[in-house]
Structures are given as structure tokens and as C-alpha cells.
């Protein structure tokens, strides 16, 4: 009875939550009765903790409404419900390996063993263990972990999007390494979208398009980076459309990345953009301050360097756009320290990164943020300083305040002064409000990410 009601509960939650929230947290859950207790099985600890913290009240309320005092107790566990665990499969017949392309060569000229070449592009150094997690990327990592544990399951396809250098490629390789660890014979392919195009062109030139199709449709998991480069390549899109359909029909995992939300990719057919959103779409945002510091400390530790906390915070507060920029800056600091033999101090970092820091301070000012946000929301610059409280003005103003806190080194009182002499508590409220809305509203989350990209580019 309670298990059948669970399906109704899922229906209510689907109506109440956004598509992304439902796909991320509710769809993977499995339910089973044990006595008077309804056990909800989550695929991993992250999903379990999130559901228990965010949705348990809604779930309990539903069962109380339906069953009153007879509502079951709830318990959470990790894994699959016992009755859903399959028996060990009989050994499968070994299929002949499809021809495998070798990097840099003609598609048909280099047939190779399936396992070795299918996973030849997975970088073993990119693991979940060395991926620094923060609020900006925790949903992406959680989804990637679930895919690694259960490829072809709830999150298929998985679409990760965000600016350059934020860790999307790291997650792709981490998933590939996770799948191969669990199943060493898995045929996993990672590639940039341009490589797919090149392989198809070579196949056409060599009259080998059927072999091309067999190869890409025989994989267990296909990961394609920077899918936006398919734009205006009609034949490649046509071939990928059919490859996509074939893999999904076979419950084979697909992960795609892009620098923008699927519907915002110009030059890509609507039928493809629609399919990109069939599974789960997750934004990877620029790392917040604490994550930037953690990235620097992890990188320094891996390099055998003792990086003082105050130096890590100094760099992280001034370089905000992406992980790649942070790591590049730290590499420059380490190289300068090795060449000169000087200790790594804040003054030393100022000298070593003089050009980077000057450029960043020149690009990102409160005035620049106000102008960019006003243009983005199509309001007047004067509205940023006005006392108007209508949502169409107040929300962009709050967004600009939050971005000023994130992207400049100005204090809350200084930010308030720049917004028409407002009190620092008003700025603090704006920052907290935008942080809350980024979790609740897909549109606000998108706006924030777009503005960060614009201001940091």
C-alpha cells in the first residue's frame, strides 16, 4: 500500500519541483516496505543527505494526509532495494570488436582491439578524489558520481554546461575512470566534438561511413566535450542525432558538455537541443571564494609547496573567473619562487602576478558591474542608485550587489555607498537573497552564471 502511494508522492513532488530538482533528487530513489517502515534507497550519500534535509517534511506530510496515524515510518539507506537487485547474469557471448579509429589516422586504416582504444582518451589522473568540490559544482559532481556508479540509469544523457576552465572535462574523465574501475571491459569513449566531426569526414572520404556508425554505436559510454562546436555542421549533427538515439535505446550512457545551456546553443538543430535535455542538465558555475582557496591549497600540496593561508586567500580574492586561471597563476608563483629562491609571501605574489592582478582590477569594478547588469536586465543605470522597490528594478539591483561582493574587493559599506548610499545590511540581505534564489530558481541561476562569464571574460 505504502509503496504504491510512493508513486503518487513522486507525482506530487514532480509537480512541486523544477525538472532539474526532480531528476536530480527524486527520480533516483527506490522504495520498499520493511514491516511498518518505508525504506527509501538513494544511489549515494550526497543524494541521501540532500533528500533527508530538503524533502523529508514534504514526504511525511503526503503520507500523513493519505494514511493519517497509519502513515509508515521513513528510513533512508544507500543502494538499491533488495527486490530490485538482479541475479548475476549468465556469461554473454563475446561479440566481434568494431573497428576502432586511432588518433591522427584514417578512420578505416587502423582497426585495433576494442577495449584498449575505446578508453584510450580517458585520462587516469582525473579522478573524483582530486576534484575540489564546492557549492558551485556540487550538483555536477553528485550527478557524475551517480553516472559512474549506474551508467545508463536515471541521468541519461547528462549535460554539463558552464564557462571554460570550471572542471567539466575533469568530471567527464572521472566518470570514465569510475566506469572502467567497476567494469574493466567497458567500452568508454571521451572526445572533443571536433574529433567526432573529423572522424566522420575521414569515414566519408574513405567510403567507410557504415564502419563509423558501427564504431560509435557500439560503445557503452560516449562523452563529448564542447558540443557547441557542432553548430552549423549539418551532416555531423545528422549523424550524431542517429548515434544519440541508438545509444539511448540501448541504455548506453551519454555525457555532453557545453559552454552554455542547451537551448542557447545557436546553429544546432532543435531536435538535438531537445534531446540534450532529456536526462539531467546541470550548471557548473565559477568557484566561490572558499572553493578557490581549496583549489589553490590542493594544487600547492600536489606540487610539494607550502602555500600560506593568507597567500591563498589573497590570490583567490583577486582571480575569480575559473579554475584554469587559478592554477596557471599558482604555477607562475611557484616557478618564480623556484627561480629566485624567495619565500612565497603576499608581496612576492603581488610582484609575480602584477599584470594579471592589474588586468583583473581594471576589468571588474562596481561601476562596470552596475552597467553590465543594467544592460542585461534592460533597466536604466539610474535605477541602480534609485529608491524604486518594484521587482523589475530591485532584483537586478540585488544581483549587482551580490556580484560586487563576489567580484570586487570592496567592503559591504563601500558597496552600499556605490548603490546610492545604502546601508551595509541592505547589501548583506541582497547577497543572501540572490544566493537563495540561485538554489530555487533556474532563471536566476542562469542570469548569475551569464553575468559572471561576461564580467570575467
From Swiss-Prot:
Biased composition range(s): Low complexity: 84-99
Amino-acid positions noted as binding ATP in the UniProt annotation, renumbered to this chain: 165, 167-169
Gene Ontology molecular functions: ATP binding; ATP hydrolysis activity; DNA replication origin binding; lipid binding
Region named Domain III, AAA+ region: 121-337
The entry's keywords: ATP-binding, Cytoplasm, DNA replication, DNA-binding, Lipid-binding, Nucleotide-binding
Region (Disordered): 79-120
Record's GO cellular component terms: cytoplasm; plasma membrane
Function: Plays an essential role in the initiation and regulation of chromosomal replication. ATP-DnaA binds to the origin of replication (oriC) to initiate formation of the DNA replication initiation complex once per cell cycle. Binds the DnaA box (a 9 base pair repeat at the origin) and separates the double-stranded (ds)DNA. Forms a right-handed helical filament on oriC DNA; dsDNA binds to the exterior of the filament while single-stranded (ss)DNA is stabiized in the filament's interior.
Entry's free-text remark on domains: Domain I is involved in oligomerization and binding regulators, domain II is flexibile and of varying length in different bacteria, domain III forms the AAA+ region, while domain IV binds dsDNA.
Identification of the protein by name: Chromosomal replication initiator protein DnaA
Source lineage: Bacteria, Pseudomonadati, Pseudomonadota, Gammaproteobacteria, Alteromonadales
Protein's gene: dnaA
